[in-house]
């Protein structure tokens, strides 16, 4: 019975993934509500699967239809073939969802992103070349000239330097706080604060921060809680389940 239940769960996940692929074209036409409904269905199906199953199958629920290969191939292409000029035009004006250029999308990266999102319990993911790039993308997306960030002071040195020295050159300032002093965290939030940032395990001391308490402060001010989960990984801790937003 347990084996049958696992098979049924995996099939449900496969059906949801197929529905998402079929709805990608309609998504570009404005039917995001349908995509959201299907994503919710897929997320529910993923939650029924164990962590080890997600590690192996998410993003490539069906083997390669041509070769029947189980493992995800490493696509090294930078370009893609279009059926004709109309097909290319549709891809580039985003009326037809699909691969355009390697700098934007890659089939291997797509599987990786889906798998990471599933393991973390998120709705989507973006693959980049390094953790530093991921954090930089995040802050540059949330804040701009004149904005402010609140960050735990017990964080990775590269991130500290980014916040303390690099981003100020772009007009983005940061207040560093003791993440265990919740009054200090609260008082550091300003009208122009765009996010609170912590690490699940502070680098290098492995401090264990109370994510839910920090999340409550962030959400009370209607700003996101950004978490670096490098040390813990989703195998040990899923930050979204404790209030993280990014």
Segment roles from a protein language model:
Residues 43-46, 63, 125-246:
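Conserved PLP-enzyme active-site core in the AAT-like
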Residues 40-75:
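Short conserved active-site loop signatures built around small residues
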Residues 84-133, 158-165:
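Conserved N-terminal alpha-helix of the aminotransferase class I/II PLP-enzyme fold
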Residues 67, 76-85:
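Positively charged, low-complexity intrinsically disordered leader regions
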